[in-house]
Amino acid sequence: MSREQRGPNEKLGTVLALAGISNAGLARRVNDLGAQRGLTLRYDKTSVARWVAKGMVPQGAAPHLIAAAIGAKLGRPVPLHEIGLADADPAPEVGLAFPRDVGEAVRSATELYRLDLAGRRGGGGIWQSLAGSFSVSAYATPASRWLITPADPSVARDPTAAQAAILGARGGGSGSPGGAGARGPGAAPDARGAHLLHPGGATPGAAGSVPLQPGPEAVADASPLRVGHSDVSKLREAAQDARRWDSKYGGGDWRSSMVPECLRVDAAPLLLGSYTDEVGRALFGASAELTRLAGWMAFDTGQQEAAQRYYIQALRLARAAADVPLGGYVLASMSLQATYRGFADEGVDLAQAAVERNRGLATARTMSFFRLVEARAHAKAGDAPAAGAALKGAESWLERSRAGDSDPPWLGFYGYDRFAADAAECYRDLKAPRQVRRFTEQALSRPTEEFVRSHGLRLVVSAVAELESGNLDAACAAGTRAVEVAGRISSARTTEYVRDLLHRLEPYGDEPRVAELRERARPLLVTPG
C-alpha cells in the first residue's frame, strides 16, 4: 500500500539516476531485502514509477528498504530525506547519531530510550515500521570516530548544565516520536529508587524488581540529581542481573524486557544529572553496559533495527566512560550482528577494530573473545586461512588468561566452552563437520543451567554436524534436545537456528524420525520468538 504525496518525487528520481538503478532493478532489490527480513513484498517497476512520477509513498518498511538498496549501490548510507521519503519515518535518525559532544551524546541516548517506550506503548509499531531499516553502513561513522578518539577528555557536568539538559529533554529533541505524548511524564524522571534491581535485594521476578512508572509529579521539578557512586552501583547491579536473565531465559523474556525500562526510568535521569568527572565516567560505563544489553536482547529477539541503535549509543557512552575494552565489546557485538545479517566483511572490520584498539589495554581473556568474534566473521566470509589464524589467536590468548586477572564483569560468560562453541560454528560455516563435532562435544560437556540459550544453540550446531556427517539418527536426537531447550526460552535467534536445521532435514522428510522432530518443533515455529 502507498499514500499520496503532492507532485513527483524528484529527489528519488535523481538518486536512482545517480546510482544507475532501473525501476525494475529497485523493485527486485526491495523485494529481496524484504524477504531477507521475513517480509513478503511484491513491488514491480510500475510501483517504482508511481513512487517517482506521482510521489506515492510506500508504507511500512519499504522506505527503509529503498534507502538500503540504493545505499548498497552507492556504497554509503542514504538517509530518507535524500530520497524524499523523510515523512515516512516515525523516528528519523533517532539512535543512529554518534555525536562528538558529550552533552549531545547524552541527548542522543535518552532520546532513544524514549523512542523505545513509545514503541512499547504503541504495541511495537515504531519498531515494526522500521523493520528492514538495518544498514551495516550506519556503523561506519561510529566505528571510525571511536577508533580516532576512544575516550572523551572530560565528562563532568555542573548543576547549571544538568538543569539545562533536563529542560531540553523535557522539551523533546528533534525526531522524538509521538509529539507531546512522547515528551510527557517519564521523559526525564527526577526521582531515585525505581531500580531494575530492588534496593532491598529482591530476587529476580519479585514485584519489587520491576521499575516503577513515574507519575506527572516526577517531572514537576527541574532540579538536577547530584549523582554519586551508590547510584552507579545500582545500575551495575541491574546490568549483572540482566545478563544472567538474558543467558538463562532469552532476550524476549519479561525479565530481560525490563532493561529498556531501566534505561528510561533509572539511567536517563542520572545521565541528565550533575556529577564529577570520576562519577561521570563510572555512570557512562554502567549506562553503556545496560544499553549494549538492550541491543543484544533486541538482536536476540529479531529486532535488528532497535539493536543497531542501541549498539551505536552504547559505543558512544563507552567513549564517555573512557572504557576502551567496553567499547571493543560493543564493536564485537556490532560485528556479530553484521555477520549474522550477511555482512561478513564488515563484521571482520568491526572485530579487527576492537582487537587493534585494545592491544596493551584489555585482559588476555577479553582479547581472546575479540579474536573469536573476528574468526566468526572470517568463517562466514568463507576465508578458512584467516578464520583458522583468528581461532588460533583466540585460543592462545585464552591460554594466557589467569583466574586472578582483572577481567570485566561483562565477560563472565566467556570461557573455553564458549570458545569451543563458536569454533564449532566457524567450522560449520567452513563445511568441516569433523571439526564441528570435535568442538561441539567439548562445548556441550559443561553445565548448562546458567546459559540455557547457548546450550540450545550448541545442540543445533551439533545436529547440523551430525547430519553433514551422514548420522541422521544422531542429528535428530540432538535436534529434539534443541527443540526442548528452545521451548523453555524466548529467543528468536534460537528459533531461527531450529528452523535452519529443519530446512536442512527436508531431503529426509519421509523419514519417521524427521517427521517426529518437525512435529515436536511445530509449536515453537508458530509462536513468536
From Swiss-Prot:
Region (Disordered): 167-226
GO BP of this protein: sporulation resulting in formation of a cellular spore
Bias kind Gly residues: ranges: 169-184
Superkingdom: Bacteria
The entry's keywords: Sporulation
Keyword Glycoprotein among UniProt keywords: no
The entry's DNA-binding region: 13-31
Function text: Might be a catalyst/regulator pair of proteins involved in the temporal controlled sporulation process. The decrease in level of the smaller protein early in sporulation may relieve negative regulation of the activity of the larger protein.
Protein name, as recorded: 55.5 kDa and 49.5 kDa sporulation proteins
Lineage: Bacteria, Bacillati, Actinomycetota, Actinomycetes, Kitasatosporales
